[in-house]
UniProtKB/Swiss-Prot annotation:
Keywords: Chaperone, Cytoplasm, Nickel. Involved in urease metallocenter assembly. Binds nickel. Probably functions as a nickel donor during metallocenter assembly. Residues 144-154 have a biased composition (Basic residues). Residues 135-154 are annotated as: Disordered. This is Urease accessory protein UreE. It is found in: Cytoplasm. Disulfide bonds: none annotated. The lineage of its organism: Bacteria, Pseudomonadati, Pseudomonadota, Gammaproteobacteria, Cellvibrionales. The keyword Isomerase does not apply. NCBIfam families: PRK13261.1-1. GO terms for molecular function: nickel cation binding; unfolded protein binding. InterPro entries: UreE, UreE_C_dom, UreE_N, UreE_N_sf.
Length: 154
């Protein structure tokens, strides 16, 4: 079984040899076991709270690199040219701590008929879909990235 304990920094020197396609719920697990597209078992053991983002690369202990891809899953899509309505919907969904993908003219969340009814009640159209789900990291959530500035504590 392949094991990964960290993400790789992207770069042209990386030779990605395999990939895993996983849901958002699986990408937010700090410890998880999956089968790669080549049929190899992979276990990742990452820092708690770290969420794998579509396209990120895992560095395996044997020196190989595996790309993480977001799987299609059951989502609700909300599209509108009305920025105020979309902003209101994002506010109400965020107030319920719903993981939310925010894009130009759309919102996407994991399908939930109660949330769909709430968003419709705000005057928006909701469409059920199967698509990759890539929600925003929370404002207070660490991304696991590098700390690029220095603190002088003298």
């Amino acid at each position: 079984m392949l094991e990964a304990y960290e993400k790789a920094e992207p770069g042209p020197e990386l030779e990605v040899t395999d990939r895993v396609v996983v849901s958002f719920d699986d990408r937010k697990k700090s410890r998880h076991r999956v089968t790669t597209e080549r049929g190899v078992e992979l276990g990742w053991f990452l820092e708690r709270g770290l969420v794998l983002v579509d396209g990120e690369i895992l560095k395996c202990t044997d020196g190989t690199f595996v790309r993480v891809c977001a799987a299609d899953e059951s989502v609700s899509d909300v599209h509108s040219d009305n920025t105020l309505l979309l902003t209101r919907a994002a506010y109400h969904l965020g107030n319920r701590h719903v993981p939310l993908e925010v894009g130009a003219g759309y919102l996407r969340y994991q399908h939930d008929h109660v949330l769909d009814d709430m968003v419709r009640g705000l005057g928006l159209h909701v469409a059920a879909a199967r698509a990759p789900f890539n929600p925003e990291n929370g404002a207070y959530h660490g991304t696991g990235g590098h700390h690029h500035h220095h603190h002088d504590h003298e």
